[in-house]
Amino acid sequence: MTNQIPSASSAADFGSSKSTSVDAVPNMDKSSSVRRKNIDSNGLQQTNQIEQAESSLNAEADHSEPERYGCTPSGKVFLLPKEQENRRSILETVDPRFSKTPWDWIVISSILAQVLLFFMTTGAVRRYSMMLCFFFWRISYDAGIGFLLHMQSNHRKVVTWISDFGFFDKENHPKLYDLTKKQLISKMDSSYNYDTSPLEFNSWLVFRHFVDLILMCDFCSYILMGLAWTCWPKVNIILQFLRIFGGIALIVFNYWVKMDAHRVVRDYAWYWGDFFFLLRSSLVFNGVFELAPHPMYSVGYAGYYGMSLLTGSYAVLFASILAHAAQFGFLLFVENPHIERTYGTDINHARLSPRGEDNEFELPPEHDLVGFVNFDFTRISDVALLIIALYSIFIILLSSNSHYSQFWAIFQAFVWRFLHSIIHAFILFYQSKSKAWTKHFIRNGESAAYAWSQWKGLYNLTLNMSYISFVMAAWKLYHLPSNWTYGLVSLRHALGFGLIALHIYTSVSIYEDLGQYGWFYGDFFLPSRSPKLVYQGIYRYVNNPERFLGCSAYWGLALISSSAWIFLIAILAQLSNLAIIRLVEQPHMQKVYGNTLRKEAGISKLIKQATSEKGNILPKTVETHMKALTTSVDKVLDQTAEALEEFVNTAPPKVQELLKGTESNLRKNAQLAILKLFAPQLSSSTHFDYKLEIKGIDNNQVLLGHPITVCWTASPNHEINDWIGLYKLSDNASDLYTQTSSEGRWSAIDANGYTSHCSSIKSLSNDKNSGEVEFSGDLLFWETGTFEFRYHYGGKHLVMAKTEPFVITATSMNTTDVDEVSAYLLKSIKFCDPNITPHDGDASLCDISEGSARKLTSIIKYSFGIDLSYRVVQVDGSCSALSRRIVNSLKILQSFDGPSGAKDD
């Protein structure tokens, strides 16, 4: 059976593209997508002819029943007869109450031959005979039907062969013609007209009969094989009950999948109708098609594993696995190529990287290393990964199996997993919160695309090494079983490899759906192109498939190795994965895409429908319990997120406060000793008037970089080596003694008192009891905040006077006009270095000193919010180039703050 979904549009619409709206009926994946393209290259030219034919058919049809139309490759439109359920057709074939056609007797004889073989043989002969029968019919299905469909898809050979063989040739093969006509009419509704139906439709009906033969014999042979291999495993009663209950549940589930799939796709897709003609009616894809990708080939074979449980036979299990794998091969090599050939491939919108007018977002082609795909020996990051990986592998392979070697393997796996989780979490957390990663690279003159490129290399390195080291640890702790039939040894290995295969499939599906942009968290580092998400591929069915399926290989290797240490690392990987998704990814998606995030995935909607519809097969309590479980898990994760965020926000200030408090206590003790030493001098000077004021200040605010003039007045008995320092208001708790160093931000009041820091003296009165000093350049703080000046006595740190606290502020520049930015920088440069006076934006800044460049980057940081390295100023070499860089950086960062849209949590 196929899960390829027929067209929901008219022939005139065959060439249209798919809707990408989240609110639309969900699109199927490539093998089950809404088919829109006409297989005839001249189909668009036949639109009028098709519409006229359809109008004629509509006039004659009975409007009381829904009508469906087919379209042949030649463009002929015909009315499809009403369907008779394939279940009824199959049951009538074996039901003795109905008359039988010659073909029915062929089918019955094939089934009875297998049953007879089952009862005529015993022991090993029966078991292997039944297994051979099953494999024969499986090969007939996958290879036989596959070959026929391949030839039909590529060359229309099945229709040609059936026609050439004489099935519809009344003149040359009248008996075969009559038998065919009688057989088809007996299995169809009264609305079917053999003579007027197109050749393609009648050929499809003949093809269906061969398919039914293979399907019925395949089913019968599998049941007989299961009965032949049935045994009673030696396990306790609880496991016996779980085995039987699980087997029955899987078989019932399999039956529901098949029936629900047939309800949706009907016989047309069940029997690969679109290999012969196209259907022209709308289908609503719900039910099982929202449960899993390729449901007819994935969950549709759950009954295989149910039967394996009931029989208790590993032979049946491995035969089922082999048959299931062959079915996926059928999908891969027969159906998917037909879909792509007939309907084209879908444009994967999620894979598209952001593009815009700004060259910043013109990303190079996708050639980054993913795993070891796209490996390039000329790329140092690729070579580094290869060297580290080979070192990690060979150090384990070449070492002995001692406890030390096992410890090293476990330690290596733990460290890489821990590093991957920590680096992954913290970089993405701070990137989402403040774009810290991007700003770091912009600061050094790089682009946002370069920042993302570096993240991709780091992420791929830690991800690959976490996998490689874990595999090597599992290898080191694995012991080859001496008895594969003992206990659950074979089952552990089968489940383990199954989980590994599931992990690989999930990862490949995620990458195919998201592309490199999504795989490497592009919307954390670059602006999203679309405000909405397209839920396609595996994301149609589940939100965050990597949440659990993304760690299935860890659990698979843990089962295979049967090591407690490997289980422990698997638990660490699973918990860290859950934490990153819940604490980092989901908040970011909510922030970027807002209310357009999907509330329910396909599986959730399916369960909800199953518990709400009339006559549902699931009790309402199932939905209630699942909601309660989900709520509980989310509540725990929310509380963890709040605690983690509180820790991240409060831990650094608390640590800083603790260190500062310790330092303050030490300084206070030293302060007391110094105050006692200088107490006589202080007591003799307390009656004199010391004053300190800032000249020309408005509202106690000063612009960043602007010179500050300080007026001072001192006692006639003051010392010539008195001095004035500039400090942050929060740096000194005492008003009597300065506890922190001025770090060069001080000025002498008298040139006779010092040999340096005298150039800032603007004036000194004749009696030398008052004067002015100007703080500029290196004497200033080049950051915003609240500050104060302090007058100190006699070259010491004894405070005689202070100014009122004042605030250094920066002009907020919100413009992205290059000329305005350049003009602002020209004004600011004179405060950074008075010796540089560029007259226009193209004047050279190549000779600017490191100190002056640092001052200019401080002004840029507080005025524009762009943190640049001083080297960038020197490299750009002019205000114009620097202005363009600032504007481009602003556009990059502002693009992250666009309107909220939608993305999957």
Curated annotation (Swiss-Prot):
User: Hydrolase: is it a keyword of this entry?
Assistant: no
Q: What GO molecular functions are on record for this protein?
A: phosphatidylethanolamine N-methyltransferase activity
Q: In which pathway does it act?
A: Phospholipid metabolism; phosphatidylcholine biosynthesis
Report the transmembrane regions from the record.
105-125, 129-149, 210-230, 237-257, 269-289, 314-334, 380-400, 409-429, 457-479, 494-514, 553-573
Which protein are we looking at?
Phosphatidylethanolamine N-methyltransferase
What does this protein do, in the record's words? Answer: Catalyzes the first step of the methylation pathway of phosphatidylcholine biosynthesis, the SAM-dependent methylation of phosphatidylethanolamine (PE) to phosphatidylmonomethylethanolamine (PMME).
Cysteine pairings via disulfide bonds: none
Residue ranges, Lumenal side: 1-104, 150-209, 258-268, 335-379, 430-456, 515-552
What's this protein's family per the entry? Belongs to the class VI-like SAM-binding methyltransferase superfamily. CHO2 family.
The way it spans or sits in the membrane comes to: Multi-pass membrane protein
* Chain intervals with Polar residues compositional bias: 1-22, 40-58
PANTHER family per record: PHOSPHATIDYLETHANOLAMINE N-METHYLTRANSFERASE
The record, for InterPro entries, names: Phopholipid_MeTrfase, Phosphatid-EA_MeTrfase_fun
Sequence ranges on the Cytoplasmic membrane side:
126-128, 231-236, 290-313, 401-408, 480-493, 574-905
Phosphoserine: residues carrying this PTM = S353
HAMAP family for this protein: PEMT
Region of interest called Disordered, as start-end residue ranges on this chain: 1-73
Query: What do the Gene Ontology cellular component annotations say?
Result: cortical endoplasmic reticulum; endoplasmic reticulum membrane; perinuclear endoplasmic reticulum
UniProt keyword Cell inner membrane, yes or no: no
Enzyme Commission (EC) number: 2.1.1.17
Native species of this protein? Schizosaccharomyces pombe (strain 972 / ATCC 24843) (Fission yeast)
Question: What are the protein's UniProt keywords?
Answer: Endoplasmic reticulum, Lipid biosynthesis, Lipid metabolism, Membrane, Methyltransferase, Phospholipid biosynthesis, Phospholipid metabolism, Phosphoprotein, S-adenosyl-L-methionine, Transferase, Transmembrane, Transmembrane helix
Question: Could you mention a single GO BP entry for this protein?
Answer: methylation
Chief subcellular location equals: endoplasmic reticulum
Q: Which reaction does it catalyse?
A: a 1,2-diacyl-sn-glycero-3-phosphoethanolamine + S-adenosyl-L-methionine = a 1,2-diacyl-sn-glycero-3-phospho-N-methylethanolamine + S-adenosyl-L-homocysteine + H(+)
Can you say where in the cell this protein is located? Endoplasmic reticulum membrane
